[in-house]
Amino acid sequence: MKRAASLLAFLVLLVVAFYRDASSQSNLVREIAPGVFVRLAEPDKKIIANAGWVVFRDYVLAIDANYPWGARLILADIRRTTSKPIRFVFDTHYHADHAFGNSLFVDSGAAVVCTEDCMEESRRKNTPAWKGDKGEAEFDLKQWRLEHPQLGFTNRMVFDDGAHRVELIPMGPAHTRGDAIAYLPKERIAFTGDLCGTRAGNNMADPDADPENWVRSLDRLSRFDIATLVPGHGPIGGHNAIAPQRLLFSTMIDGIRAGIARGESADHIAQSLDLTGIHPNGEDVARTQASIKAVYAKLRK
């Protein structure tokens, strides 16, 4: 009797765990338009970037391959929404959290697409980054292989089957030289990668960042007809997500230039330039101060 009760309790826990996982899954995957999906990040699982996919009549175009452990879950999520073959995965830029999962998509039958500049950055920078990785256990990259993009474009690449139209449009240099977005004009959706973020913090301290061109790229992005903006990091937003990041960057650059003209040090400007009032992007003080120091060094060159 005790054994039967224990078995019943175990089965109940198993069912509860299953439904908890299913509930979590439904919260992570959003269908933001018919056949257009977003898979939100899971930072606690080191899946720090959002991803997406578009289900065409005969195939699937995925957007951002994530890390390998993220790609594995994203591929499973895609299979829950469609059985159509995954023919392409688009890397918005070459960084690890958006592109290191490429090989899993290739093994599923997809070709990796990005800008020509992104292809060059991947070949030049991702090989040493991959080899120098210090991840452990499930986050050890040695379990997988590095796969560089195979198809490149310089102006734009368009996927259109009459039901969906996706335009891959170069936007760099900004966050990286090879930045590009996926734009769906019919649905007014933009997958922006790290060109635009909707959370506290920013990536201006990244060595690849081009501060002044990034502002110009955000100005260009603001001219798109966007109802839904899917950032590389942060919650899904709208067109109004662009202005705060643009304001943060332009105010930062202007403040640093003024400080340099006064002969101030990077540390002094980082401590005195208060950008916390710019919601939400300016609210991470530590990241903003790191960005100020990085931009200071670039503007002094």
Placement of each model-derived feature along the sequence:
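Conserved beta-strand hairpin/beta-sheet module of binuclear metal-dependent hydrolase folds
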Residues: 30-77, 182-194
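Positively charged n-region of N-terminal signal peptides that target proteins for export
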Residues: 1-4
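Active-site metal-binding motif and surrounding structural segment of the metallo-beta-lactamase
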Residues: 56-61, 69-113
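Divalent metal-coordination and catalytic microenvironments
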Residues: 35, 54, 64, 78, ...
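Bacterial N-terminal signal peptides
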Residues: 8-17
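Metallo-beta-lactamase
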Residues: 26, 30-31, 59-60, 67-69, 120-255, ...
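Accessory terminal helices/loops
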Residues: 223-225, 236-301
